[in-house]
Amino acid sequence: MNSNNWLGFPLSPNNSSLPPHEYNLGLVSDHMDNPFQTQEWNMINPHGGGGDEGGEVPKVADFLGVSKPDENQSNHLVAYNDSDYYFHTNSLMPSVQSNDVVVAACDSNTPNNSSYHELQESAHNLQSLTLSMGTTAGNNVVDKASPSETTGDNASGGALAVVETATPRRALDTFGQRTSIYRGVTRHRWTGRYEAHLWDNSCRREGQSRKGRQVYLGGYDKEDKAARSYDLAALKYWGPSTTTNFPITNYEKEVEEMKHMTRQEFVAAIRRKSSGFSRGASMYRGVTRHHQHGRWQARIGRVAGNKDLYLGTFSTEEEAAEAYDIAAIKFRGLNAVTNFEINRYDVKAILESSTLPIGGGAAKRLKEAQALESSRKREAEMIALGSSFQYGGGSSTGSGSTSSRLQLQPYPLSIQQPLEPFLSLQNNDISHYNNNNAHDSSSFNHHSYIQTQLHLHQQTNNYLQQQSSQNSQQLYNAYLHSNPALLHGLVSTSIVDNNNNNGGSSGSYNTAAFLGNHGIGIGSSSTVGSTEEFPTVKTDYDMPSSDGTGGYSGWTSESVQGSNPGGVFTMWNE
């Protein structure tokens, strides 16, 4: 065998295993059952003729090329043999390798030599090469013949073509290719949404050849959200040295939060934030609205023999979401994907329960617990507010209204202690003080006022020894507001004025004593020669002026009750 022969079978004419055959070399071989298909070179006559000008089809004189055996060995051209051997794969060559080369040549000098698989045509009918390209056309290489050979072939009406066969793309070539540009993200082939997965190689399941398991991180509408979920899970599992889709500096806040959580808890938190799958008209997982009565119904899938479990209908979607969460915890444990935070539920009671605590049980208990917790918070707020709350009491002065504040504390004095100034003002007969001189009456009133203020000041000093932080005005103001029954003391006096009325008429006076914000107010209403009902007048006044003149300015009077509005006057307002 020649050392230059690369075909794998002998080209010697003495080989008896290759008997000569005659072929009708037209457009298609007569013995071919199947035509040429795509990704092959077809030799087609554009004019539809396969013979010479005389209409005769050229015959194969010597199939093995007895006339020119040297050219067969020097040119290394492929001679076609039995069609059953060479065309069983619908290609021009036996598929020895993926890149087989087929050379077909035509020589006008040897018209009867068909050992080179020559197709005889007329000078003006040139054969054309038709190329059917598929998806792998970029892998095909066509080598043209040299210019000298092309010139000789064109002159004789032949053509030379070198063809490199294409390799079909196998299914295994596409296996494992990513459907997303991000790591750990795949695109669902049906829904078109994106899912994030993480491969946890820290464990090995029984019966698996590959170490580890796939951790589902949820489905997402956006590809970048799924990529971020993968990054967070990868940082939790493998630390900052892992490869992420986005810079680690984008996750500084999440990295601090994940330090206080386990892997399972953090993955569950990531999955709770997923929003990729349709949930009907509700924003909660496992909750849909009933199409007839509009109530919310809850379902959970893949629990009862890999089927959906109907959980019931609820008036609100929050209750339906809670029912789904309880069922998810019951069937899937701590790794369950819930609508609300898992610490809202009594996980231990749910897992230990022999039945599913749904149907007004767990949801109502949850609401009761929330109501109790909110009431406790309100009580704590009230206690904290009461410790710093200042009770405001208004004091009426001549210049305006000011507000004094006092902490809500019980008044330390007993009831009997502040009664002394009131008793000293009641049922006092002051007729022996009545003179014709107005100055004497004013002196008496001034003396009575000073005695009362000294009495009050003594009690104030006793209290200030116990509570040095509060002044007397604030304490008595708060005490009098909390004990309104002690505010009014009625002083009835009967004065007969013989000087002014000349003995012809009598005057009746009703005087009301009132302990106001800062001292004592005295109001009076009078009628002359009448027995009608007298109104009670409450009079407030300011403290004595600081200039030492002893004047009483800023007195005001207010009618409290009575059918006679007349006779109200301002005292000591000269």
Curated annotation (Swiss-Prot):
Intracellular or extracellular location(s): Nucleus
Any GO CC annotation of this UniProt entry: nucleus
Stored CDD domains: AP2 (cd00018)
DNA-binding region extent: 181-247, 283-341
Expression tissues: Expressed in roots, seedlings, flowers, and siliques. Also detected at low levels in leaves. In roots, specifically detected in the distal root meristem, including the QC. This tissue specificity is regulated by auxin gradient and depends on PIN proteins.
GO MF annotations, alphabetized: DNA-binding transcription factor activity; transcription cis-regulatory region binding
InterPro entries, sorted: AP2/ERF_dom, AP2/ERF_dom_sf, DNA-bd_dom_sf
Signal peptide: none
Transmembrane region(s): none
Modified how: Stabilized in root meristems by reactive oxygen species (ROS) mediated oxidative post-translational modification triggered by RGF1 hormone peptide in a RITF1-dependent manner.
GO terms for biological process, alphabetical: auxin-activated signaling pathway; ethylene-activated signaling pathway; pattern specification process; root development; root meristem growth; stem cell population maintenance; telomere maintenance
Residue ranges of the region described as Disordered: 536-566
UniProt biased composition (Polar residues): 554-563
Keyword tags: Activator, Auxin signaling pathway, Developmental protein, DNA-binding, Ethylene signaling pathway, Nucleus, Repeat, Stress response, Transcription, Transcription regulation
Stimuli inducing this protein: By auxin accumulation.
Domain of life from the UniProt record: Eukaryota
Described purpose of this protein according to its UniProt entry: Probably acts as a transcriptional activator. Binds to the GCC-box pathogenesis-related promoter element. May be involved in the regulation of gene expression by stress factors and by components of stress signal transduction pathways. Master regulator of basal/root fate. Essential for root quiescent center (QC) and columella specification, stem cell activity, as well as for establishment of the stem cell niche during embryogenesis. Modulates the root polar auxin transport by regulating the distribution of PIN genes. Essential role in respecifying pattern and polarity in damaged roots.
Family assignment from sequence similarity: Belongs to the AP2/ERF transcription factor family. AP2 subfamily.
Protein name according to UniProt: AP2-like ethylene-responsive transcription factor PLT1
Organism: Arabidopsis thaliana (Mouse-ear cress)
Lineage of origin: Eukaryota, Viridiplantae, Streptophyta, Embryophyta, Tracheophyta
